[in-house]
Regions:
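Membrane-interface alpha helices of multi-pass inner-membrane proteins
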Residues: 119-120, 152, 164-179, 214-216
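Membrane-interface transmembrane helices that cradle and orient dolichyl/undecaprenyl
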Residues: 108-114, 149-164
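Transmembrane-helix motifs of polytopic, lipid-linked glycan transferases
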Residues: 90-111, 148-149
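Short acidic/glycine- and proline-prone juxtamembrane loop motifs at membrane-interface regions
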Residues: 128-142
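Membrane-proximal, lumen/periplasm-facing interface regions of secretory-pathway glyco-
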Residues: 311, 335-395, 404-419, 425-428, ...
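Transmembrane-lumen/periplasm boundary regions of multi-pass, lipid-linked membrane glycan transferases
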Residues: 185-285, 291, 295-303
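Extracytoplasmic catalytic/substrate-binding loops of multi-pass membrane glycan-assembly enzymes
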Residues: 38-52, 61-73, 82-87, 379
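Short helix- or helix-capping micro-motifs
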Residues: 27-30, 119-127, 131, 172, ...
Length: 504
């Protein structure tokens, strides 16, 4: 590899124009393809997506487990095209179009347009992005605003004006309101200042700190909401406490990153971390590595400490990873390696597009109970139809369940036809629905209770009248299904505690 000094001038204008046009055309076409794929998808809303939709029906400055931006986005998309699965998910491909464009622009500013092209395409075709672009979760706006904040930071590092500080403040603030993981950006700023001369000089500019402080101020309404709600969001992380040191979860997390970022990007990133002090890396390379390091290090450490390390928790690390890995591989002239990375991503994208259209017919032999690989996101629409029909015929005034999964799904797929409550056994709320839809003895009755337990005897002494309505079974794939029992309950005795344990 040959060393390139920071601030190397971009290539000729014709090349810039050509590569910019190629990039925009490719990502625009892929965005349209993803939107078309959503139209033909047979996949139901995931429980998280359905929960975020419920939030959008009750706009606030905070919710049990997340800041509020995802709800506002869902509400906005609902005003445009309604509340179908396709419409709820439509913003995701658009946000990733924007994120990839921002990665392209940041890489072009730091290096050149060719690096920008490869970095932007690596972002757009990363398997994790292709997966995430099919669903509407908090990672979608988070990565967009992280990329925007990084572009503004790079512009300021290159001596940009106060206008870029305003962009940084807005991006950082909106990112915090998308997901608290945006706070890793602060660690990236500090770490970059230790390893890059340009980044160190930027730390001395008041405009940077004013921008970051302005972004933090944008989280004030959410902080006040948490204070008024007994810091419910902090309580949502109570499960992630120290149990016993383990290395299994962090190792699985690191292995998963090869699938999330792609084997070329993440493999190259690990090599760059290993040779961080190499003379072949310049200050800009190290600054980008500095932004990638905090999420990865924190999540690995948390995995060792608590045994919790989900594959998507370090997603912000990938934004600068796309840039620095592309820069190093372009400088080394490793075109086949770059192309192989994009080819891997394109194959993953194609499989997801096809899989979503045949999800209800897709099964993979040899995986045992997990052969129906879409079973987590199938059958919920059918459950909503069956429960709604049974509620009408039985004369139920409300529906109740005892798990978050069914509460989230029925709340969306019943579309307000009946109130849906959760009968939780926890003395303190453990999720959003525990907090806002708890089953109470003085609520509407009779109650259609949908449960995995088929024993009517469990309600003895809790309800005066119990009617066994039989079972409900919905397919969750070609070889799998979910089976529930339904009971009509009335005459609740007070106080109504948690649901009795299912008898053997």
């Amino acid at each position: 590899m040959t060393r390139t000094e920071p601030g190397t001038a971009p290539q000729a204008g014709a090349r810039l124009d050509r590569e910019t046009i190629v990039f925009v055309c490719v990502v625009a076409a892929l965005t349209v393809l993803r939107l078309v794929g959503q139209h033909f998808s047979v996949v139901d809303l995931d429980i998280e997506e359905a929960q975020y939709w419920d939030w959008s029906q009750h706009l606030a400055f905070g919710y049990f487990s997340k800041p509020p931006l995802i709800a506002w986005i869902n509400a906005a998309s609902g005003l445009v095209c309604g509340s179908t699965e396709e419409c709820i998910r439509a913003p995701a491909p658009l946000f990733y179009f924007g994120a990839s464009l921002l990665v392209f622009l940041a890489a072009k500013e730091l290096y050149d347009s060719r690096t920008g092209l490869w970095a932007g395409l690596a972002c757009m075709l990363a398997p994790g992005v292709s997966f995430s672009a099919r669903i509407m979760t908090t990672d979608v706006p988070l990565l967009f605003f992280w990329a925007l904040a990084l572009l503004a930071y790079v512009k300021l590092m290159r001596g940009g004006s106060w206008r870029w500080a305003i962009v940084l403040a807005l991006a950082f603030g909106l990112g915090l309101n998308a997901k608290y993981a945006m706070a890793y950006f602060l660690l990236g700023v500090l770490l970059a200042g230790l390893v890059s001369g340009d980044a160190r000089r930027l730390l001395k500019r008041p405009v940077l700190w004013l921008a970051l402080f302005g972004g933090i101020l944008m989280l004030t309404p959410n902080i006040l909401w948490n204070a008024q709600n007994h810091f419910a969001t902090a309580g949502a992380t109570a499960d992630y406490v120290h149990k016993a040191l383990t290395f299994e979860e962090p190792l699985e997390f690191l292995a998963a990153q090869f699938g999330v970022a792609g084997p070329i990007v993440f493999g190259t990133l690990l090599v760059l971390f290993a040779f961080f002090g190499s003379r072949n890396l310049n200050g800009d390379d190290r600054a980008m590595l500095a932004f990638a390091a905090p999420p990865l290090v924190v999540i690995v450490a948390n995995g060792v400490w608590s045994g919790a390390a989900n594959a998507n928790w370090a997603a912000p690390a990938l934004i600068s990873a796309f840039i620095v890995t592309a820069a190093v591989l372009v400088r080394a002239g490793m075109w086949r390696t770059l192309a192989a990375g994009l080819a891997f991503g394109a194959i993953a994208q194609g499989l997801l597009l096809v899989g979503d259209t045949v999800a209800d017919r897709l099964t993979v032999p040899g995986l045992g109970d997990n052969a129906d690989i879409y079973q987590r996101v199938l059958g919920w629409d059918d459950l909503g139809e069956d429960v709604g029909r049974l509620a009408v015929t039985s004369g139920a005034a409300a529906v109740a369940v005892e798990r978050r999964w069914e509460e989230s799904a029925l709340n969306y797929y019943l579309r307000g036809k009946l109130p849906v409550y959760i009968w939780s056994g926890s003395p303190q709320p453990t999720n959003h629905f525990d907090m806002v839809y708890p089953l109470a003895a003085d609520g509407p009755q009779p109650i259609l209770f949908v449960t995995l337990c088929d024993k009517a005897a469990r309600f003895d002494g809790v309800f005066d009248r119990v009617t066994d309505l039989g079972s409900l079974e919905v397919d969750s794939g070609p070889t799998s299904s979910r089976r529930y029992s339904a009971f009509l309950l009335s005459g609740a005795r007070r106080p109504l505690g948690g649901p009795p344990v299912c008898p053997n």
